[in-house]
Swiss-Prot record:
Deletion of the TJP1/ZO1 interaction motif (ZIM) decreases but does not abolish colocalization with TJP1/ZO1. The gene is CGN. It is found in: Cell junction, Tight junction. Homodimer. Interacts with TJP1/ZO1 and SPEF1. This is Cingulin. Residues 1-342 are annotated as: Head. Pfam families: Myosin_tail_1 (PF01576).
Length: 1153
């Protein structure tokens, strides 16, 4: 914001040109002109403060000499900072060259009131804020587009405000004419009133509130802060405005045009100074009163109201409405800074969004890379856990086997102890028999010795067999110890491996958990950032939509400006035609005047004719003033066309277009009013010309001043031709701008076509989505069929598992029954062997007693011992075979139990897998139902959005058709307005207005009101159109989001379908594996049946052997009961050959121990 600025008074310098050259050279530092005439006189008035431009009036009193009117330069000359400013632009014969002063100082002339003071050549003023001509330090100017900064700042304490009007220039001219003794020249009448000297104070004007352009850059205003003087109450920055051209219309209209010019963009000041030269009077230095505090809306409203109200005959309501309209048109300029900040921050936000998106993609990739490793580690952990369970089961099984082997070893030791006791008893019996033999007769001693030797050999063989059995037992014990050590080492190594794997799995799981937590945290942070960025993006989208709406509004305003430019072109063409007609009329009148002047020279003779000639000269001056006003009007139209060209060139600055459009509209209204006033003045001019013709017809003696008037008219004609060329150039520029606007229109049509193509693409994408939905329905049907097949396979698996369970139960029952039978048979064999041993012991005792009684019982004893040996050997062999069979059966039973447990576990696994598959299938069905519902909802939304888009399209078409109709109506109304204006122009030729003029004016007002109503309706339609476009954009964004959601769901469904297919393949592989296991179990059952059959055959053979042994024992007992009497019979019956034959018949070898 700019600092508050105090008012700055303006100085006026007045210099009489006819004063001596030396004095003028002393005061102003100018060199005397070489071709200066002695009779040149006039008044040079410089108004300091209006953009530093001088105001010059030069009059000449001699005949045939040139007199110059009012001229103010429109802009400074471009030059370096130290270049001096030119004061006047005069012809060669009247101009005086300017003297260059120091760099950075302002030029000035000396008034007649300030002679005698050496510093008065600088035009210093007391009671003002700063020196008008002192050096002004330049600072960086900040261009503010806010309307609130344009108001006059508050006054400082003690600052003197001169509110009295300036003395007019006419009074100064009149004073000079009286000093020369001549007659009053120039404009006389309403400005002949001279004020007292004490009331001739300089006033402050709002013109000084405009920023002064620096010499370096005329586009940006740079405030200058002159050094404060002792007489000033405060110092503040005071800019200077551009001069405003004036004409003969009302002063209120002038001030209104001045306000409109001050509200323009500062870049209009960069025009060529030669183009922006206007002629004006210092009437713009008006009285101003104190205003409200600066920076407030009320202050601006009060200033605008005071400017528009003064000198105007309009009502207060209309003036207030105009003030509010100006404020509304200028208000959007405040919003440009916020939009610029938003656009500046948009790039940074986009970069942040890209960085966050890249980080999110990296985290997702890392997670995707870690996911298979995590799954593999989980699978390895499960496998290691299963292996640990399997090793634990193997350890328990080995422990059970060791326990069984220990019990078997204890049983073997007991049996060995029993055999040792039997052997010791037999040895005692043999010793007793030896003693008996020693005591017995000699012939029987040799036989007994042979028997003893045989029994000794048998005992040695028994001892060797015992040793072999003990060695086998020791070897078994060593093997058991080695197996125990190996099992312990293996179990320890497996425990270490399991512990290592468990620790590794724990570390991996912890790392995975940490990485998952970090990823979840990062994802949460990214999600939060994404939400923030999405909120920012939504805000930016809203702002972009608002800016797009504003751009649409600017485009509409631009179109309106274009139409207004066309209307201005048509008005310019009409003015050109009127100018041509006026030129033709002036040429005809000049020819008539020349003819009449020639006639008047021939017959001029009296004082009455001289007076009439002077009156005619006065009328000619009035004609010149009217021509000057016409030229000013043409310059106004040229400035309007240049402003229109600049507005079209500044198409990129959309924010400033509204203010320019408002200014153009207001200028158009001002131009229309000026055109009406100029038309009235033209009518008055025509009437004056008619009166002049009548006077010329009456006088016919006017000769003097005709040639001068003719020269002036020629100059005016040349100037008119120059203005005509300028207007043609402006028209060419306007045509070029029309071409650029047509290109912009084509670009907008291309954008509309692109939007239509986008809608067609959306329709195609919707069709693709419908096809994808149909494919998903087909995939669901396929999944349903796969689910039915899986259920059938599950039923088959359940049946096979039940059948296998039944078969396993039968096999287990059969093996248990066979084991019980074998155990019972073994127990029977043990009891029989025990009874036989007891019987043998009892019989041995009996035989010993009988041997004691008779020596003939020795042979029986020997036979009995042999039989006992044979039975002992047979029982040992049976025990060994039974033990082996028992071990084999126990191993087979354990194997069958293990296989049954494995099959049971596999069945449990299968049931669990089947249950999990059922759960997955049910969950997938639920998800499919949910997806179907969501897809249906999405299709409904898409259909609704399509209907809404169609409805909005139809509404847009209706709005466009309505807008076209309104434009057509507007064009027709404009044509009617032009026709009415033409009629008014044709009717203005009459002196007395007709009765239809008021009616035409009322019709014109009605047409203008209709145009305003149509403009309002057009704005309403544009606002509705913008709302509809915003709704279409929202719907398109919503459709894109829903499409993205549908694509995501489709991808998820495809992934789930692939997972289901993979699970189906795994289930098929599991089914094949179960079929292989079933076949393997069947083969093992068949092998078990064969082994059972072999065992049963062996058991039957053992039963036959036991039956034979029982029969043999019964035969031997019968032989013992017969009581053989002689030793020969004993020897014949129980000789070694008979014993060997018995042994061979029974199938038991004596050396098989």
């Amino acid at each position: 914001m700019a600092e508050p600025r105090g008012p700055v008074d303006h100085g006026v310098q007045i210099r009489f040109i006819t004063e001596p050259a030396g004095d003028a050279q002393m005061r102003t530092g100018r060199r005397p002109a070489k071709d200066a005439r002695a009779n040149t006189y006039g008044v040079a008035v410089r108004v300091q403060g209006i953009a530093g431009q001088p105001f010059v009036v030069l009059n000449s009193g001699e005949k045939g000499s040139e007199s110059f009117g009012v001229q103010i330069k429109g802009a400074h000359r471009q030059g370096p900072p130290g270049a001096p400013h030119s004061d006047l632009e005069l012809p060669a014969e009247h101009s005086r060259p300017l003297a260059q002063e120091n760099a950075g100082t302002w030029q000035g002339s000396v008034s007649d009131e300030e002679l005698g003071d050496p510093w008065r050549g600088r035009l210093l003023r007391s009671q003002s804020q700063a020196s008008l001509l002192g050096p002004a330090p330049l600072g960086p100017g900040h261009r503010s587009t806010s309307l609130l900064e344009l108001g006059p700042p508050g006054l400082g304490a003690g600052s003197a405000i001169d509110t009295a009007p300036l003395s007019s220039v006419d009074t100064l001219i009149h004073k000079f004419d009286r000093h020369q003794g001549g007659q009053a020249r120039g404009r006389t009448g309403r400005r002949m009133r001279a004020l007292p000297a004490e009331q001739r104070k300089r006033s402050q004007s709002l013109d000084s509130r405009h920023l002064r352009d620096p010499p370096e850059d005329r586009r940006s205003p740079i405030p200058w802060a002159p050094p404060s003087r002792p007489g000033s109450a405060g110092s503040s920055k005071q800019p200077a405005p551009k001069p405003i051209p004036t004409s003969s219309y009302s002063r209120a209209r002038q001030t209104q045009d001045w306000v409109l010019q001050n509200f323009e963009e500062p870049r209009t000041r960069a025009q060529d100074p030669a183009v922006l030269q206007f002629k004006s009077t210092p009437d713009l230095l008006r009285d101003q009163q104190e205003a409200a505090p600066p920076g407030s809306v009320e202050h601006v409203k009060a200033a605008l109201y005071g400017i528009l109200r003064e000198g105007s005959s309009e009502s207060d309501a209309s003036v207030r409405r105009k003030v509010s309209l100006v404020l509304e048109q200028m208000q959007p300029l405040v919003m440009t800074t916020g939009s610029a900040k938003v656009l500046a921050g948009q790039g940074e936000l986009a970069q942040k969004v890209e960085e966050l998106q890249r980080k999110l993609d990296e985290e997702v990739k890392k997670r995707q890379v870690l996911e298979p490793s995590r799954l593999e580690l989980e699978q390895q952990l499960e496998e290691k856990a299963e292996e640990c369970l399997r090793l634990q089961e193997l350890l328990e099984r080995q422990k059970g086997e060791t326990r069984q082997s220990g019990t078997e070893l204890q049983n073997l030791r007991l049996l060995l102890d029993q055999a040792g006791r039997v052997r010791s008893e037999l040895e005692t019996q043999v010793m007793e028999l030896q003693d008996q033999l020693k005591q017995g007769p000699v012939p029987a001693k040799e036989g007994l010795m042979k028997d003893l030797l045989e029994t000794r050999e048998l005992l040695e063989e028994v001892l060797e067999g015992k040793q072999r059995v003990e060695e086998q037992l020791r070897q078994r014990e060593r093997e058991l110890t080695a197996l125990k050590g190996a099992l312990k080492e293996e179990v320890a190594s497996r425990d270490q491996e399991v512990e290592h794997v468990r620790q590794q799995c724990q570390r991996d799981t912890e790392q995975l958990r940490k990485s998952i937590q970090d990823a979840s945290q990062d994802q949460a942070a990214l999600e939060a950032e994404r939400q923030k960025m999405s909120a920012l993006v939504r805000g930016l989208q809203r702002e972009l939509e608002e800016t797009s709406e504003e751009t649409g509004h600017w485009q509409t305003m631009f179109q309106k400006n274009k139409e207004e430019l066309r209307a201005a072109k048509q008005e310019l063409l009409q003015l050109r035609m009127e100018k041509d007609e006026m030129e033709e009329e002036l040429g005809e009148k000049m020819e008539a005047l020349q003819r009449e002047l020639g006639q008047a020279r021939a017959g001029a003779g009296g004082s009455r004719q001289v007076e009439e000639l002077r009156k005619l000269q006065g009328e000619a001056e009035r004609v010149r003033e009217l021509e000057q006003q016409n030229l000013q009007l043409q310059k106004k139209t040229q400035q309007l066309s240049q402003d229109c060209a600049e507005a079209t060139k500044a198409r990129g600055a959309r924010m400033a277009a509204e203010a320019e459009a408002a200014l153009l509209v207001q200028r158009r209204t001002a131009v229309e009013t000026t055109l009406q006033e100029t038309q009235g003045e033209n009518d008055e001019f025509r009437r004056r010309i008619l009166g002049l013709e009548q006077q010329l017809k009456e006088t016919r003696g006017l000769a003097e001043g005709g040639e001068a008037a003719e020269a002036r008219l020629r100059d005016k004609l040349q100037r008119l031709e120059v203005e005509k060329q300028r207007l043609e150039e402006a028209l060419s520029e306007a045509q070029a701008e029309e071409g650029s606007l047509a290109a912009a229109k084509r670009a907008l049509e291309a954008r509309l076509e692109e939007a239509q193509r986008g809608l067609s693409r959306m329709g195609q994408e919707q069709q693709a989505l419908s096809r994808a939905l149909e494919e998903e329905g087909k995939q669901r049907e396929a999944l349903r069929r796969g689910k039915a097949e899986l259920e059938e396979q599950k039923r088959l698996l359940d049946r096979t598992v039940e059948r296998l369970n039944k078969e396993l139960e039968q096999i287990g029952e059969d093996s248990k029954q066979a084991l019980h039978q074998l155990q019972s048979q073994l127990e029977d064999y043990k009891e029989k062997s025990r009874r036989e041993v007891a019987d043998a012991q009892r019989q041995a005792k009996e035989w010993a007693s009988e041997a004691e009684k008779s020596s003939g019982g020795l042979s029986r004893l020997q036979d009995e011992t042999q039989r006992l040996r044979q039975t002992l050997q047979a029982s040992q062999a049976d025990l060994d075979t039974a033990r082996l069979d028992k071990e084999l059966l126990a191993q087979r039973l354990q194997g069958l139990e293990q296989e049954a447990e494995k099959k049971r576990r596999s069945q449990d696994d299968r049931t669990r897998q089947v249950k999990s598959l059922e759960e997955k299938v049910s969950r997938l069905e639920m998800e499919l139902d949910e997806e179907r519902n969501t897809v249906e909802l999405l299709t409904d939304r898409i259909n609704r959005s399509r209907d809404q888009v169609d409805q909005l399209r139809t509404e847009l078409m209706q709005e466009r058709s309505a807008r076209q109709d309104l434009e057509c109506d507007k064009i027709s109304l404009e044509r009617q307005n032009k026709d009415l204006k033409g009629r008014l122009a044709s009717l203005e030729g009459f002196q007395k207005p007709s009765a239809s003029l008021s009616q035409l004016e009322s019709q014109n007002r009605e047409l203008q009101e209709r145009l305003q109503a149509e403009d309002r309706e057009k704005t309403v339609l544009q606002s509705t159109n913008r709302k509809l476009e915003r709704r279409v954009k929202e719907l398109s964004i919503q459709i894109d989001d829903e499409r993205q959601h549908v694509n995501d769901q489709k991808d998820q469904l495809s992934l789930k379908v692939k997972a289901l297919k993979r699970q189906v393949d795994e289930a098929e592989e599991e089914i094949e594996r179960l079929d292989g296991l079933r076949k393997k179990a069947q083969r093992e059952l068949e092998e078990q049946h064969e082994a059972n059959e072999q065992l049963q055959a062996r058991i039957r053979a053992l039963e036959k052997d036991s039956w034979r042994k029982a029969a043999r024992s019964a035969a031997e007992s019968s032989l013992q009961q017969e009581g053989l009497s002689s030793d020969e019979e004993f020897d014949g019956v129980y000789n070694p050959n008979s014993i060997a034959s018995l042994l061979t018949e029974s199938g038991l070898q004596t050396s098989s121990c």
